[in-house]
Amino acid sequence: MEELQGYLKKDRSPQQHFLYPLLLQEYIYTLAHDDSLNGSIFYEPIEFIGYDNKFSLVLVKRLIIRMYQQNFLIYLVNDSNQNRFGGHTNSFYSHFFYSQMVSKGFSVIVEIPFSLRLVSSSEEKEIPKSQNLGSIHSIFPFLEDKLSHLNNVSDILIPHPIHFEILVQILQCWIQDVPSLHLLRFFLHKYQNLNKTIQSNKTIYVFSKENKRLFWFLYNSYVSECEFLLVFFHKQSCYLRSTSSGTFLERSHFYGKMEHIIIVCCNNFHKTLWPIKDPLIHYVRYQGKAILASRGTHLLMKKWRYYFVNFWQYYFHFWSQPYRMHINSLLNYSFYFMGYLLRVLINPYAVKNQMLENSFLIDTVIKKFDTIIPIIPLIGSLSKAKFCTFSGHPISKPIWADLSDFDIIDRFGRICRNLSHYYSGSSKKQSLYRIKYILRLSCARTLARKHKSTARALLQRLGLGFLEEFFTEEEQVLSFIFPKTTLFTLHGSHRERIWSLDIIRINDLVNN
């Protein structure tokens, strides 16, 4: 326990930042709305109405004062209804735009102390900068190396916090600027009250949709709290040589923690500390889904589940449903993770041993980590995006029919190449051919819809090869990467795993 207290004290150094005055600086909003900055991190850029509006200190001050008024929320909702039917000039979208921009600027500001902490931590540990934003594909070689030697796996869905106040409490030990915390609390309660006004229960969904950057920052800080003691015990038990598997894949592993966690551990976890100091525990997470695997028995995994449930209950003050943590044997279980269907196969082999004049057969078993393309979820994603029917029958994309022929083919080709690139690590790529067929025929039918023709007539007139330039096969891409003298055979590349180091997020069509 003394080691835990020292670890907490070391990683909980208070932040003495005065962040609130930065909210009145105009350049903050330039950073908040810079598409290139948004593209460098893991959030999609958000399009705002009225991009050409300019900010000033007076305007921001007036907006903040007005946002703190009690009738501001009611005014927004009433003005929205009036504008919808009466077309008033003081539109809801104008006020919503300014409110969004202040919220977006605030999200940039609160990231500043954690970015500085991340840089200093990386320099202390001598972590290369290229690994600081590592590819999400770097998780799979780690799983490929470890899972085949383990016995049990637990598939975990990290629960969302029930109340937004929990997120504010998490940040209190990191940000000691009281006005900034009050403003954060206001934003969170504003979205919660807005959902009550419009009779909606999707508070977290609406908040994450309207301000993705701030939501993911708060969610990552919350997840890092969930993982904090797990990382501590893992550091005490073993040393991970693979830095890519523990190097802030989402810039989410921050270090400040709350003081009363020591009391929580002393009072509530003294009976559950001993079983989790096992060096054979392996933990991987992406977004809200985590994988916990061990060579130990089923009882050990049940103790880990007991630890997680009690930690969430006593530290975050909410109960986690047991069904969120499934414990299964790796030999009889397949699970979805990051768009792949993962499993461990058993390949029996018979080895003939010759000793002098006697020979005998030795039966042996080799475990193999298998990565499968989930064809049914992929077809479901294509169906939701209106590329095909639910049964996989290709259809045209009417919303793209007004684009030029080049843009239509380029968009379909980009989706096809992205899927081929992401699933280059699959052990069986034949399933991807059906997805490529759906996209090609959907592209042909979209072009035929634009030219008021049929897909068959279009293909007969232009030929089957006119799409090949855009729907580049993975083997053709690899031919430019690997020299001809290499031992790697492109003919068998559909059976080879190729993990890419330039993929920082999953494509929208991938089921995650």
Curated annotation (Swiss-Prot):
Keywords: Chloroplast, mRNA processing, Plastid, RNA-binding, tRNA processing
InterPro entries: Domain_X (IPR024937), Maturase_MatK (IPR002866), Maturase_MatK_N (IPR024942)
Localisation per UniProt entry: Plastid, Chloroplast
GO biological process: mRNA processing; RNA splicing; tRNA processing
Keyword RNA-binding (UniProt): yes
Single GO cellular component term: chloroplast
An MF annotation (GO) of this entry: RNA binding
Entry annotated with the keyword Metal-binding: no
Function: Usually encoded in the trnK tRNA gene intron. Probably assists in splicing its own and other chloroplast group II introns.
Family: Belongs to the intron maturase 2 family. MatK subfamily.
Name of the protein this chain belongs to: Maturase K
Organism annotation: Lilium longiflorum
Taxonomic path: Eukaryota, Viridiplantae, Streptophyta, Embryophyta, Tracheophyta
